[in-house]
């Protein structure tokens, strides 16, 4: 029974690679400016030590543990080591404001937090403000925190893998819903292991592959797109602390990486360094995938021109629904603007506003990967999940050859550099300023981010508040990716016949005023 539970636990997903290549380097970590290499054997040993530490500290199966950690090997060790003890890790978006992170950890009733003091300026104060049973600290010591490495070194007996049922939760990533409020997706061990095998069929990795991660590890693009497939196959990857275009290109060349994944901004920004790119030996690079947001065909073309020997593709996926669209297994080329066709292992539907099957409509997905629901969000769970079908909120159409094409969102959410932005969320931030009377936010095109927030603001009479002051205000109080890049101070907002803000008119005016500027503003 213990062996069965081990095989059903996502924390042991790379067991086959561990047996084949135990002493092969799995991760080359560049955190702190120096290389730290971890073999498969070392990863397994430290994950097992984390599971034993959890039992010694009284962390029980089913309890949630928070992760305020940046891009470093400890993130991966803790993430999967937690699952080996039956705990449920929360890989948190360290770009969020302190108040939002505090709310998430408190709402999830986390009993422990692993804190990386370099990940968030308020990381320690966030952990201190919550009624956690235990607080673990990386790299440092501080009152009220246990030093992570010292605790890991404490002797602890071997443990049996906990019982894993079909619906046992593995981890809880956070995504944004129709309200823009982060919500925790309940992801199961069974669904995640099913997806690892599914991913290997359509986007196969090999022992000879070496990936490069510059995106945040809390993001699905990194965990689902590189960490799991590479470790499952027995390959290796380079882990960068963050993204900087020249360092990224240098990493691809120096470590002879065979593939890399990223959001559109990653590719747009490194294309600004074409001369440097051309000076590097990138002959090992075989494929690159762009995902997490709509990809302009012009960007795909530009990357292929810069790297003609590299296969460049786009992908579509959701935190709570996986990647239901994939390249055809028969090798047919994927048309520009399409992430692919429906996989036979995954049920998909397009429905119109009446819930009827249609040639164009909202994409619905059903497969073992789909989340069971959203933690402490019964109403959103009822809205998004019906009989196992996930309502993605994305409008697609399908051509006669079965290829899908993204059209828009059901709601007005948009993606800014791979991060979900909700206009209402940004508007509420603007409304919090005492000099703001009214505001409307809409997406405008941007060369790097795809879309960025722009705002029309009506100020209090007599106020001298400026657009730059309001930008700084939003940057200080909300996530950086959601702050309005452009603000127009106007005497009034466009209204429709019912006296409500005419968002369509506001969008048209903002795009007319700022689209050209936004397209030329790179790296914001």
Identify the function of each model-found stretch.
Residues 7, 22-25, 155-174, 181, ...:
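Conserved pre-ATP/AMP-binding loop-to-beta segment of ANL
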Residues 32-36, 118-166, 273-274:
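ANL superfamily adenylate-forming
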Residues 193-210, 218-258, 273-274:
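Conserved AMP-binding/adenylation subdomain of ANL enzymes
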């Amino acid at each position: 029974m213990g062996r069965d539970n081990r095989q059903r636990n996502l924390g042991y997903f790379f067991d086959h690679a561990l047996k084949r290549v135990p002493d092969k380097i799995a991760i080359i970590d560049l955190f702190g400016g120096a290389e730290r290499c971890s073999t498969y054997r070392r990863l397994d040993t430290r994950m097992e030590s984390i599971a034993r530490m959890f039992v010694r500290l009284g962390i029980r199966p089913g309890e949630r543990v928070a992760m305020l950690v940046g891009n470093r090997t400890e993130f991966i060790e803790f993430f999967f080591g937690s699952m080996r003890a039956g705990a449920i890790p929360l890989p948190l978006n360290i770009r969020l404001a302190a108040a939002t992170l505090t709310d998430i950890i408190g709402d999830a009733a986390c009993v422990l937090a692993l804190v990386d003091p370099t990940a968030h300026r308020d990381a320690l104060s966030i952990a201190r403000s919550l009624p956690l049973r235990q607080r673990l600290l990386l790299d440092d010591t501080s009152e009220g925190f246990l030093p992570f490495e010292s605790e890991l070194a404490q002797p602890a007996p071997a443990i049996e893998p906990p019982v894993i049922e079909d619906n046992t939760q593995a981890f809880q990533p956070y995504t944004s819903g129709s309200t823009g409020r982060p919500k925790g997706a309940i992801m199961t061990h069974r669904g995640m292991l099913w997806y690892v095998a599914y991913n290997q069929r359509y986007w196969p990795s090999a022992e000879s592959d070496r990936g490069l991660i510059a995106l945040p590890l809390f993001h699905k693009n990194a965990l689902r797109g590189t960490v799991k497939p590479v470790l499952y196959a027995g390959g290796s990857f380079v882990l960068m602390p963050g993204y900087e275009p020249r360092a990224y290109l240098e990493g691809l060349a120096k470590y002879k990486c065979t593939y890399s994944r990223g959001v559109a901004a990653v590719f747009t920004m490194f294309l600004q360094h074409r001369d440097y790119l051309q000076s590097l030996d990138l002959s090992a690079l075989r494929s690159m995938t762009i995902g997490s947001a709509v990809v302009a065909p012009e960007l795909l073309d530009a990357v292929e021109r810069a790297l003609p020997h590299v296969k460049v593709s786009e992908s579509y996926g959701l935190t709570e629904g996986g990647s239901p669209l994939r390249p055809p297994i028969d090798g047919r080329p994927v048309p520009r603007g399409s992430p692919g066709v429906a996989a036979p292992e995954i049920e998909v539907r397009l429905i119109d506003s009446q819930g009827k099957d249609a040639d164009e409509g909202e994409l619905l997905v059903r497969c073992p990967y789909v989340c069971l629901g959203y933690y402490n969000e019964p109403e959103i769970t009822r809205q998004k999940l019906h009989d196992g079908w996930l309502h993605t909120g994305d409008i697609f159409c399908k051509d006669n050859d079965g290829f899908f094409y993204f059209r828009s969102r059901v709601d007005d959410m948009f993606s800014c550099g791979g991060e979900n932005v909700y206009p209402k969320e940004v508007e509420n931030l603007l409304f919090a300023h005492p000099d703001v009377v009214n505001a409307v936010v809409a997406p405008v095109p941007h060369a790097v981010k795809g879309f960025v927030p722009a705002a029309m603001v009506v100020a209090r009479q007599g106020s001298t508040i400026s657009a730059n002051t309001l930008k700084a205000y939003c940057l200080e109080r909300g996530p950086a990716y959601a702050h309005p890049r452009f603000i127009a101070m106007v005497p009034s907002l466009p209204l429709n016949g019912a006296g409500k803000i005419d968002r369509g008119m506001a969008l048209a005016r903002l795009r007319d005023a700022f689209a050209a500027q936004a397209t030329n503003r790179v790296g914001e």
